[in-house]
Amino acid sequence: MNKDLLRRMSEVAPGTFQHSIQVGNLAAEIARKIGGNPQLVRTGALYHDIGKMQNPIYFTENQSGGISPHDTLTYIESAQMIVSHVTEGLKLADKYNLPVQIRDLIATHHGLGKAKYFYIKYKNEYPDQPIDELLFTYPGPNPFTKEQAILMMADGVEAASRSLPDYTEQSIRQLVNKLIDGMNDDGYFRDCPITYRDIQYAKTVLIEKLKTIYHTRISYPEMNETSNAK
């Protein structure tokens, strides 16, 4: 593997680098639980977003001060910038001769999904205009190994968890269930050997790990003065 590439990412896209480490931790834990390869998926997680180094400021984890360069772009231009990190990552994988298993993890971590934020924004603002779906769609393919499905789940959940308004057990559980069930319903896992039971175990791991990361505790109701007096 290429440590210089990771060092460069830590310098030019520090938010992405930290995200990748967290994704690796989550993914490895899921792999241990459902019989995947923890080392492969952890390594793949470290490299899955290397394409973001080409334009790091366009990704929220590398932004600060509330200023976004997307404010100067159209929704289509923004979507193209977002989805391009997969193809840019594959170019770097080829340039640095990364193993094919890592290359495949880069290619599949968004599957054939869409840059949903900008896709929805466009559809809401221009409801009567025809839309070229491909302009908002990642190149794929969808995951075709268990490790690729694990990485997709861990990546999506870790990224979304950073936008939660509050970190309670309920909010974390709702987030994980919504995201993973959505991926399954959209058919992202149809081409890989992962079972319904595997997916439920993955959700449990993600919920428990995120609770630990964000130090959530079950909140107990406070006793009123009358109860305290008894």
What are these regions (language model features)?
Residues 6-19, 24-169, 173-176, 182-186:
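Divalent metal-dependent catalytic cores for phosphoryl transfer on phosphate-bearing substrates
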Residues 1, 9-12, 24-27, 154, ...:
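Long, compositionally biased intrinsically disordered regions
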